[in-house]
Amino acid sequence: AGKRFAWMGLWTAWISTAIGFYYAVVTGWCLKYFSAAASGGLGQGVDTTQVWNDFLQDPSQVIIFQFLAVVITMAAIWRGAKAIEKVNVILMVSLFILLFSALFLSILMDAQDGTLDGFVYMFSIQPEYLLEPQTWISGLSQSAWSCSAGMGMCITYAVYMRKDEDTTLNAATMCLANNSISIIAGLTVMMAIFSVVQDPLSAVSGGSSAITFLVLPEVFAQAPGGPVVQLAMVTMFFLALSFAALTSMISTIELCVRNFVDHGVDRSQAVGFTGGALFLFGLPSAALWILMDESTGVAFPQFLEVQDHIWGYGLMFSGLFIAFSIWKYGWNRYKVWQDENDIVGFNWQDYLDNGVSSFRDDFINTGDNDWWIGKWWDYIMYLGFPIMFAILMGSYFVDLLLNVDNPWDPTNPKGITIVLLFWGVTAIVFLFLNRWLVSRPLYRNVPEGAEVPIDTLPGGEDDMILQLGEVWTGGNLDNSSESTVLTAELA
């Protein structure tokens, strides 16, 4: 997008990292419940509300499991791309096996009365919810999070890809796999709940945390087959949930680590620094502002929920900034085309032919992709996305103003002021850091054997972008960084 907009990249990296601060706490919850399930602490007759309240209101327990989640994540990414690939292969294969096993048991449970009402509810449509802005906002945020859309994940992992990688097929496969797993997980949960809970609609309306940590342990404790099957089912579920959380943590934190590495920081130092920050900045979400809902008697982490609200919705701006870089690239290519052909003045048709389609032609339809992407992609990117973004964000803020008491009160965790304050301060700080960002070199890591000259890659002719192993001799860095030389990670 240009050097003036480097702060947008920092925003994208920060949003992902900020989500990681509190997501490490959530991952710790999953690990805690897996250990409790495996030891028989979530069996029949256990008061799951009491288990949840005791755990959440004991900061030492929450922090211990948060620390464990951080350590596992840092260990997985310490050695770089190959280690990440091996860990993810093990975790994802295990996740599939565990999830399908739990789905099979849930189908048996739901089919006992011959109705499959959990399956029916899962795919039933309630038109009134389609008219609520919150439905679409939540759906977009969930999609952005689960597919890593707008988080810069694919941009980060691109440094490990071959030049001839079929990114189109990979993106389609990723979305298909993600949505398939989401449907399978939803079916597993819904069919299990509807099979044993007397008031399933009340159970599923309590939110994802209530369903996961309060309802499901009770549901699995009543599964047919006796104590052995019940223990296996609840243990498998929370082990699968822990694996899913850890894979998300790995990709989220690798984004932060990789950005440090690209700016010349040794990987071991980047992992150590990021791990320390992840733990320290996650402590407030683990221990602060733990409240009790008087109507239900269930504890909830108010500080964590506020952070999730702020940075989760901030993902939409990350997506906007990435889209902006595509728009800017198209405009720059159009101006270059004008200069090369001595054309003066703006022409819509010329812009559509030589500007709008340029990103698709240069980076998507490279000749290495099996699925050719047509002009429909341009319409979605240039028209569909900005219109959708404007409508959803406008609806979101209108909904806050109309349906939240005292929305302008900065102490209101559900108000509009606290969201704008966090977003605004973050954007201002990053704008001030923009000059510092563009004065530092970036180190490009071409995998061994790729044999791709750096000047043939996008941005390779920029004197601020160096091949891994080259020495930076510029004068804008401090003395400790003037002669940074990095060694390849991908041996």
In which residue ranges do the predicted regions lie?
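Inter-helical loop and helix-membrane interface segments of multi-pass membrane transporters/permeases
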Residues: 1-11, 24-81, 112-137, 210-213, ...
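Hydrophobic alpha-helical segments of multi-pass membrane transport proteins
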Residues: 245-252, 270-285, 289, 308-365, ...
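Non-transmembrane, juxtamembrane loop and terminal tail segments
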Residues: 344-357, 442-491
